[in-house]
């Protein structure tokens, strides 16, 4: 079947794992708690369902008369089309045509299926597994019994995933977009930190200024970033106020060329306070960011944007994205090398 038209500059993103929904969203989509649920990734219209013990992602288009399978139902271990009842197995092959039960099923009666897994309470999809060198992004709190983990409701922005990533990792905007909320406006000059590439991740550390007048919910402390390319950010905060660990895991789904569905999971060591205080604080911070990031135009960063030394993180990020785009054109080995070859600036050891 045909592939959705996407910008050639973003074709390489098909090789990465992206979250498309929470498990809760899928369970709420149908009384069975199994789906199906319509989702969109890189302009591909997809359907997600749980068939037996397996989470499955397919193109959301029946091979028969092109009805959306996401309007259908789960029948046993199969996904049933709402129009004529054709049933598809976990591999996307049609196993039942009710109108012709005694006739051979045509060989073309199948739909494209894609890699699909559940991790951290999110459903992840990889559209192209041919290079097979990417993994679901790293979330440091996933298996830490000390931490309470909360999955927030996804939030949508009219912005690219690249712009969202840059916003989340931008040190010099704190004093201007988040004065009194997340940062002290008198601390407008951030340090220039060494950045390492290792195992398909950016890793860097930023020690925020101490004794800033911010709310207790503000995760201020030593920031340790582990950012799995291209759009995931794992931020571990060793909080100054309580000497405890707070983790933010933010990852953006590139829905199409201008829309981003964002997922935030947070975890904290001290959990005697209400989850809702932290959820409300995160929502407040994002509400401060959103209108500014959505105002950026064009949506994709143009080459004539002026950068300064304080923009090191976004400069290095854009450089790596360009390298991945070019390597993708050369094939699997070049892409693997561009993604996984280490580039170390700091004195940290990764052995």
From Swiss-Prot:
Residues 17-125 form the Rieske domain. Binds 1 [2Fe-2S] cluster per subunit. Optimum temperature is 30 degrees Celsius. One of its GO terms (molecular function) is metal ion binding. The keyword Mitochondrion does not apply. Keywords: 2Fe-2S, Alkaloid metabolism, Iron, Iron-sulfur, Metal-binding, NAD, Oxidoreductase. Optimum pH is 7.5. Its EC number is 1.14.13.178. SUPFAM superfamilies: Bet v1-like (SSF55961), ISP domain (SSF50022). [2Fe-2S] cluster binds at residues 62, 64, 81, 84. Pfam families: Rieske (PF00355), VanA_C (PF19112). It catalyses: caffeine + NADH + O2 + H(+) = theobromine + formaldehyde + NAD(+) + H2O; caffeine + NADPH + O2 + H(+) = theobromine + formaldehyde + NADP(+) + H2O; theophylline + NADH + O2 + H(+) = 3-methylxanthine + formaldehyde + NAD(+) + H2O; theophylline + NADPH + O2 + H(+) = 3-methylxanthine + formaldehyde + NADP(+) + H2O. InterPro entries: Cholesterol_7-desaturase (IPR050584), Rieske_2Fe-2S (IPR017941), Rieske_2Fe-2S_sf (IPR036922), VanA_C_cat (IPR044043). GO terms for biological process: alkaloid catabolic process. Its cofactor is [2Fe-2S] cluster. Pathway: Alkaloid degradation. The keyword Secreted does not apply. It comes from the Bacteria. Involved in the caffeine degradation, which is the essential first step for assimilating the carbon and nitrogen in caffeine. Catalyzes the N1-demethylation of caffeine to produce theobromine and formaldehyde. Also catalyzes the N1-demethylation of theophylline, paraxanthine, and 1-methylxanthine to 3-methylxanthine, 7-methylxanthine, and xanthine, respectively. NADH is the preferred substrate. This is Methylxanthine N1-demethylase NdmA.
């Amino acid at each position: 079947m045909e592939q959705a038209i996407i910008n050639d500059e973003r074709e390489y993103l098909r090789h990465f794992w992206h979250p498309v929904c929470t498990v809760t969203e899928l369970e709420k989509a149908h009384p069975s708690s199994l789906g199906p649920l319509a989702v969109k990734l890189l302009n591909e219209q997809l359907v997600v369902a749980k068939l037996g013990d397996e989470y499955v992602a397919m193109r959301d288009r029946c091979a028969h008369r092109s009805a959306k399978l996401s309007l259908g139902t789960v029948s046993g271990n199969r996904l049933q089309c709402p129009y004529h009842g054709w049933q598809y197995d976990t591999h996307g092959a049609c196993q039942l045509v009710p109108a012709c039960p005694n006739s051979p099923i045509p060989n073309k009666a199948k739909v494209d299926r894609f890699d699909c897994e559940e991790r951290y309470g999110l459903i992840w999809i990889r559209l192209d597994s041919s290079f097979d060198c990417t993994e679901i992004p790293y979330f440091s709190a996933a298996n830490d019994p000390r931490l309470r983990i909360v999955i927030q409701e996804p939030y949508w922005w009219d912005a690219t995933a690249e712009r969202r990533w840059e916003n989340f990792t931008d040190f010099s905007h704190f004093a201007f977009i988040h004065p009194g909320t997340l940062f002290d406006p008198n601390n407008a000059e951030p340090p220039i930190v060494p950045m390492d590439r290792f195992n398909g991740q950016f890793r860097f550390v930023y020690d925020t200024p101490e004794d800033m007048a911010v709310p207790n919910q503000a995760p201020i402390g030593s920031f340790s970033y582990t950012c799995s390319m291209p759009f995931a950010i794992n931020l571990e905060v060793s909080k100054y106020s309580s000497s405890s660990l707070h983790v933010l895991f933010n990852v953006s789904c590139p829905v199409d060329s201008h829309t981003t569905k964002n997922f935030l999971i947070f975890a904290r060591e001290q959990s005697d306070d209400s989850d809702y205080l932290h959820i409300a604080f995160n929502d407040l911070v994002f509400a401060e960011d959103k209108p500014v990031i959505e105002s950026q135009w064009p949506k994709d960063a143009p080459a004539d944007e002026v950068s300064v030394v304080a923009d090191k993180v976004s400069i290095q990020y854009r450089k790596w994205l360009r390298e991945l785009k070019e390597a993708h054109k050369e094939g699997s080995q070049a892409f693997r090398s561009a993604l996984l070859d280490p580039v170390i600036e700091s004195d940290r050891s990764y052995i």
